[in-house]
């Protein structure tokens, strides 16, 4: 009976790890057809931010330049001009299809992330007792570690998150989140987040060392500074 009770929190933790993937898989299969039909039948008004609007305008300017080129080469045989116009027409249709697929992808991922957040929030609230048990296990495990291992682990974690080579990792992670939520890639916003977020984390971490670790385990702070130096 005791083993069964001990297994329940572990099973709950495993379900939390894999639940977002299952939700994403189910939502992508069930919502994609519905969102595609809704987008195509409602003929929704296109909602673009400034960055996406600029990209769309650039594409249409390129097409307009092709049409102007078409007018400049009237001396070409009529058959060649017809093929040229047909090629431009196909490119325009292809661009519209790509744009529609991008908007459907954006709505689908935003809806999936919203549903995942709601389900995980309810699931976590429902299993808060199991989370308390898992938290006690983690605290007991960390308490049994030596101060040297704790200091080394903290140093490794901080170097990964806010170290010299961390901006590239943050750039990849923030870029993935942007793409997952369907946001357009904007280099200035991405660079601003990459340059400021690690600094904020570094400040919070130093405050945590000053306020918490100095009070709980002064020896751990001494070992950490010795390894860091």
Swiss-Prot record:
It is found in: Plastid, Chloroplast inner membrane. Keywords: Antiport, Chloroplast, Hydrogen ion transport, Ion transport, Membrane, Plastid, Plastid inner membrane, Potassium, Potassium transport, Transmembrane, Transmembrane helix, Transport. It comes from the Eukaryota. One of its GO terms (cellular component) is chloroplast inner membrane. GO terms for molecular function: antiporter activity; proton transmembrane transporter activity. It is a multi-pass membrane protein. The keyword Transmembrane applies. It catalyses: K(+)(in) + H(+)(out) = K(+)(out) + H(+)(in). InterPro entries: CemA. Its main location: plastid. The chain crosses the membrane at residues 6-26, 107-127, 189-209. One of its GO terms (biological process) is potassium ion transport. The keyword Chloroplast applies. Belongs to the CemA family. Contributes to K(+)/H(+) antiport activity by supporting proton efflux to control proton extrusion and homeostasis in chloroplasts in a light-dependent manner to modulate photosynthesis. Prevents excessive induction of non-photochemical quenching (NPQ) under continuous-light conditions. Indirectly promotes efficient inorganic carbon uptake into chloroplasts. This is Potassium/proton antiporter CemA.
